[in-house]
Design a protein with these regions (language model features):
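Helix-loop-helix "hairpin" substructures at the membrane interface of multi-pass membrane proteins
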Residues: 14, 145-227, 250-255
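Single transmembrane alpha-helix segments in multi-pass membrane proteins
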Residues: 4-54, 86-102, 244-250
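Transmembrane alpha-helical segments in multi-pass inner-membrane proteins
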Residues: 18, 69-74, 78, 205-212, ...
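Transmembrane helix-bundle core of multi-pass membrane transporters
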Residues: 94-95, 103-173, 200, 266, ...
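Pore- or pathway-lining transmembrane helices of multi-pass membrane proteins that form conduits
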Residues: 41-45, 94-119, 231-243, 259, ...
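Alpha-helical transmembrane segments within multi-pass membrane transporters and channels
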Residues: 60-110, 117, 255-260, 291-292
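Hydrophobic core segments of alpha-helical transmembrane domains in multi-pass membrane transport
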Residues: 47-52, 73-83, 108-118, 157-168, ...
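Membrane-interfacial amphipathic/re-entrant helices at transmembrane-helix boundaries
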Residues: 1-22, 49, 60-72, 98-102, ...
């Protein structure tokens, strides 16, 4: 029971990180019907910017962890927002209206470009970050085994819940959210009604990139290391989470992230850590076969 409980805590933490990345995928898909396959690299860049930010805070003598985290978070979100806007402006907008494979190929090319750019700039070796927040709370002990939740795990889950609620409110109750929903329903009609479609899509990419930055910083703090390749695997798992939950649905993206986290952690804990990725991606195949719209997704209605 103690071992199971500890793995459950670890799984929820990892699932929260995947869920934050998955929301970026699902927001973009919900409006333009395309997958931003460079989103994983934005997450990776957010982690690297966070690493640089923590190094700057250390150099400036900022020893307060909350202050350093807040400053680094704002810095990472600002930088990745620029990357998100640039990706939309260069890889998607010029190809809007072309055949559907064109933006997909362009996004994959952008992903490879960003990955190699970071590799050349930061090197291929993993970069350690050290411990940012230490300590935790022991929930209970049994059979000589302590079930602990780290303060960082609590922070990750709380931040994820707050951001999930905040973005849901933005989409449901703000002018930008109404414009996003209008573009999702019918982009041409939204433009005729006065919605600035280009601006709305760009802001959606910016919002998704900012969430990826938060996930990148949480990943860096949780695992204490970052390299140029983390965006590829984490991005694929987050995409799997978005499809599993129902791509286009924010609650579905978070649910999918939690499920992927549970599958990955419990498979590694009870079976083999070597095949945890196989187990996670097998879920994608099964979902596409038996429920293509995902757990919370709505079936698409084609107009004729």
């Amino acid at each position: 029971m103690a071992y199971f409980s500890q793995q459950l805590i670890n799984a929820v933490t990892l699932g929260a990180i995947y869920g934050l990345i998955a929301i970026g995928y699902t927001m973009v898909y919900g409006i333009i019907g395309m997958i931003n396959f460079a989103h994983g690299e934005v997450f990776m860049i957010g982690a690297f910017i966070s690493l640089i930010g923590f190094m700057i805070c250390s150099t400036l003598g900022i020893s307060s962890a909350p202050v350093a985290i807040l400053l680094v978070l704002l810095m990472a979100m600002a930088f990745t927002a620029v990357y998100g806007w640039t990706i939309e402006r260069t890889a998607y907008r010029p190809l809007r209206g072309s055949f559907k494979l064109a933006p997909l190929i362009s996004a994959i090319g952008m992903s490879i470009l960003l990955q190699n750019y970071v590799q050349l700039a930061q090197g291929a070796r993993p970069k350690p970050a050290g411990s940012i927040i230490e300590g935790g709370y022991t929930l209970f002990s049994t059979d000589g085994f302590d079930v602990r939740v780290a303060w960082l795990q609590i922070i990750i889950v709380v931040v994820t819940v707050v951001l999930m609620a905040g973005f849901s409110w933005i989409i449901a109750a703000t002018p930008l959210g109404r414009q996003q929903r209008a573009c999702e329903q019918d982009m041409k009609m939204a433009a005729l009604l006065g919605v600035d479609v280009d601006r709305t899509i760009s802001l959606t990419f910016v919002m998704g990139a900012a969430l990826a930055a938060v996930a990148g910083m949480m990943f860096l703090m949780y695992y204490g290391v970052v390299d140029f390749f983390i965006g590829f695997l984490a991005g694929l798992k987050a995409f799997t989470a978005a499809v599993l939950g129902g791509i286009g649905s924010l609650p579905g993206a978070m649910l999918g992230g939690l499920l992927i986290g549970l599958i990955e952690v419990f498979w590694a804990a009870y079976f083999s850590s070597e095949y945890k990725d196989v187990a996670a991606f097998s879920i994608l195949v099964l979902v596409l076969i038996f429920r293509p719209t995902g757990l919370l997704g709505k079936p698409e209605i084609e107009k004729v």
